[in-house]
Curated annotation (Swiss-Prot):
GO terms for biological process: tRNA methylation. The active site is at C333 (nucleophile), E367 (proton acceptor). It comes from Aeromonas salmonicida (strain A449). GO terms for cellular component: cytosol. Keywords: Methyltransferase, S-adenosyl-L-methionine, Transferase, tRNA processing. Dual-specificity methyltransferase that catalyzes the formation of 5-methyluridine at position 54 (m5U54) in all tRNAs, and that of position 341 (m5U341) in tmRNA (transfer-mRNA). The gene is trmA. It catalyses: uridine(54) in tRNA + S-adenosyl-L-methionine = 5-methyluridine(54) in tRNA + S-adenosyl-L-homocysteine + H(+); uridine(341) in tmRNA + S-adenosyl-L-methionine = 5-methyluridine(341) in tmRNA + S-adenosyl-L-homocysteine + H(+). This is tRNA/tmRNA (uracil-C(5))-methyltransferase. S-adenosyl-L-methionine binds at Q199, Y227, N232, E248, D308. NCBIfam families: trmA_only. Belongs to the class I-like SAM-binding methyltransferase superfamily. RNA M5U methyltransferase family. TrmA subfamily. One of its GO terms (molecular function) is tRNA (uracil(54)-C5)-methyltransferase activity, S-adenosyl methionine-dependent. It is an enzyme of class 2 (transferase). PANTHER family: TRNA/TMRNA (URACIL-C(5))-METHYLTRANSFERASE, TRNA_TMRNA (URACIL-C(5))-METHYLTRANSFERASE.
Amino acid sequence: MTQIQQAGADSQALRTPADYQAQLDEKRERLTQLFAGFNPPALEVHASPAEHYRMRAEFRIWHEGDDLFHCMYAQATKEIIRVDHFPTASLLINQLMPVLLAGLRPHFVLRRKLFQIDYLSTQSGQIIVSLLYHRKLEAEWQQAAETLQADLQAQGFDLRLIGRAHKQKICLGDDFVIEQLNVAGRQLTYKQVENSFTQPNAAINEQMLGWALDVTRGSEGDLLELYCGNGNFSIALAQNFRKVLATEIAKPSVDSAQFNIAANGVDNLIILRMSAEEFTMAMRGEREFNRLKGVDLKSYQCNTIFVDPPRAGLDDATVKLVQEYDNILYISCNPETLQANMAVLGETHEVARFALFDQFPWTHHMEAGVYLKRKAG
């Protein structure tokens, strides 16, 4: 094993604010060049905190006798690197890491065949820890885990512990946390469920939501969002529109979105559990769905659509669907696929706003946002 104490901390100790700005400037130049052919306006650049910006982290666990450590695999060499501190992750995760290991070490039943620990933290102070095992978890494990959770809570951690094994999930309390985001002077509440997608960089998420609010301010008509997840964007944007329709297919995400709608007092947003293809058929009157009983689609005038697709971007059919709307708000975690989609969308729409969000500092990855308006004539 490659014993690199505080691997993350040592590598970041040499980084300066100038180093952060240099990597951000390189991304600015790269994104500007990538979209030069679409004649966008000046790029709006949103910087991230240089450390403690990632709200979730996953670590493999390395065992040496009765001891155990967090570790990661070096991408280039596949070496196992011991991680005692991880400045990329939130301060809360870093505070909990050594305390959690200290609580695990004395208990063989908690250590045995433990191979991974996942953390999901929040700015609100709540955190979920998932312990992953290569064995079935018995009553003895649950009893020891409940004691560990109580000990950690007594030390001041607002923690929920979860045990996972093959076809097994044991929750010692809730399997979600409640996050608080400050967006354009307003506090928004979001339920985030363990093992479901959430935006990894809370500070950048707040900036993305604020930017999306700004670019859609003064919008007329209604908003449609495809695959809304837990309602992260729809809930923030609802104040700018008469009504909002959002689609999502994953039931846990739909349930979280419904919770978040109520928690934030939003009264003009409806979540539909259906795919983009099904929604398109329903809007065009090609098929009826029982799930739409009580929803009058004809009362909606959705002239703005919001999409935040996975790294693969939008498929051809969805690009054509999106192209039917006058205003398109597109957040992309892969500017290369956004550029490919823009080759089609750019035939009918022009870029009105253009943004870079440094969601993943110190990596080559970029998050981009474009607000497109239909060309005149």
